[in-house]
Amino acid sequence: MSKVIAVCNQKGGVGKTTTAVNLAASFAALEKKTLLIDMDPQGNASQGLGYNEMQDVDIHEILNMADNPDNITYDNIKEAILDTSLDYLKVITSGPDLAVMEIELVNAMSRERRLERVMNVLKQTFEFIIIDAPPSLNLLTLNVLTAATSVLIPVQCEYYALQGMTELFKTIREVQKNLNANLKIEGALLTMYDSRLSLCKQVAEEVRENLSDTVFQAMIPRNVKLSEAPSHGKPAILYDVQSSGAQAYMKLAEEILNKGK
């Protein structure tokens, strides 16, 4: 069965997009048919896979099309599904137009379910669909959580790591109650970890204490190759497969696969 993982944290700068791109690339490297959907109007995930220009058909067009469920067939949306440098990885890009979608959806019928309609079609083709959610708790994020089977939460190893998590978990509970009863927590992922810093170790312990079993064993280190890769339009695994960042995301992908067995 297809898995739709929303990478979500309304707090910026926690490694959300880095995680979405590199987890998707890792699944693809493991020969899983994978799709990355960029739902962030900033379009950084698209850029991280080499798509710097706005595309003729992107996620904004697809969500508009999904106003009428009958429009959503694979043939109608395949133009938006683009190739990447990895055979098993495709992407649906985003751009600034997506920010307008928030206003367009306000008075729309079933406004939280647009992406879910699209997902019902895409799940028939892909084993893993990774969604890079917007860095805010808005209607676009509600669409993401309604369409997802699980949520992965990146948590930066810094002093205010758990700040804002209460709000995110409250939103997830509301979605579970009203829109998507099957939504699960895939796990919390510690990012930007530096074993030389006692603060990082302290925060990692605190996060594990607070979130216990939901925290992944894999931790993403602070790594220069992870920072450089997007400017080359590549995931870390293609930029430097031996880097600690690329290896950490591969471990994360394997952990998720093993958990599902």
Segments from the language model and where they lie:
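P-loop NTP-binding core
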Residues: M1-K261
